[in-house]
């Protein structure tokens, strides 16, 4: 873990906290934010950045999900359950975001200290273990078969997944992103995605193999730790942990120079999302 510690050890972490913006903060804005910050960091115009974010009742689909044979029926089902639906601009499959899920992005220069793909994932895994080290639990990174959006860096306790990590690289910057299920029922979130896939596939043969979701493979941290641990609790732990690695944490929003790039990125992402969902005018 020494290399992941070295990435966390920065002279300064820029902190962009968007965890309490409420239901009007749209998930497409988040992806535009990370693309903008990645570009600034890649250009050497920004320090390494931690961005935290929460979105209310949103299902984030992957590109492969947009090719489901009965996608419209699946989306109608999700909307009936009061969920917004978007397609993200990177790989992976469907995930659930709501008020009980904290999302964290770590963004740093790609060239710095030779960051390969696994090292980016290891850095986030190490951060989460440090945040929760006072609990007597082992946090493993391995694929949890039966979970939604399964991957080799699923984070789990006793084989129940509470977090998933993804990674995006753009213009010399790296964004390592994680969703952390803090409160609520992990199995209920998983059941929602299972039912979405059932409606969107309807037993048809597909070129891509979609996950067969077993809701009991997923849980929230509150369920796994036996006590309520809220998004706000995780935010406090996150900031305290980053303070151990950096002498300076600097609260920030987008700079004047970053705002035009953000607006360009947001429009591009909106257009791509509409195309993926067949919403083009």
From Swiss-Prot:
Q: Which Gene3D superfamilies match?
A: Bira Bifunctional Protein, Domain 2 (3.30.930.10)
**Residues under site feature: Lowers pKa of active site Cys:** 161
The organism's place on the tree of life at top rank:
Bacteria
Q: One GO molecular-function annotation for this sequence?
A: lipoyl(octanoyl) transferase activity
The metabolic or biological pathway listed in the UniProt record of this protein is: Protein modification; protein lipoylation via endogenous pathway; protein N(6)-(lipoyl)lysine from octanoyl-[acyl-carrier-protein]
PANTHER family linked to this entry: OCTANOYL-[GCVH]:PROTEIN N-OCTANOYLTRANSFERASE, OCTANOYLTRANSFERASE LIPM-RELATED
Role summary: Catalyzes the amidotransfer (transamidation) of the octanoyl moiety from octanoyl-GcvH to the lipoyl domain of the E2 subunit of lipoate-dependent enzymes.
Name of the molecule in the record: Octanoyl-[GcvH]:protein N-octanoyltransferase
Gene encoding it? lipL
